[in-house]
Amino acid sequence: MKPGGIRLAAVKQLTKPEEIVARIREIYVPNHFMSDYFHIDIDDIRCGKVTVSLLTDPRKHTNHREVLHGGVMMALADSVTGVTGASVGAVVVTVSLTMSFIRNARPGSRIRVKSHITHNGRTTIVIAAEMYDEDDKLMANILADMMIVDHFPEIPRKW
């Protein structure tokens, strides 16, 4: 069995972008961490590029100073990397995640992360991303090194 309950023998590689996007959503939308705990929305999926967003909740996502908690920002950054890996057919785990915090966002506002692959190797993927507030002001620069641990055989490396 492959991730997402796919049997290797029964897998046909998808070719239409809308089918690939639907399959990636099918894999990640039911993810309890992304959907139930944080309510992360997958806004856009393209080959090697993903945008996710989060409507921040002042009751759940702030720290003792009543500003957006840095851990929430890191969780959103880490979540986009898995979806970005899947967009090129890779099942990935985080090896290193670096975030340069630039500014915070208003609690109750929507924040968004736009990612893109800068290196797609045989065993690793490097993903760069930027986090923005709802006024399109840069909040953080992100760099992630991901290890490829498996592949989604139905999702092509390029599409």
What do the predicted segments below correspond to?
Residues 1-159:
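Terminal targeting signals and extreme-terminal segments of soluble enzymes
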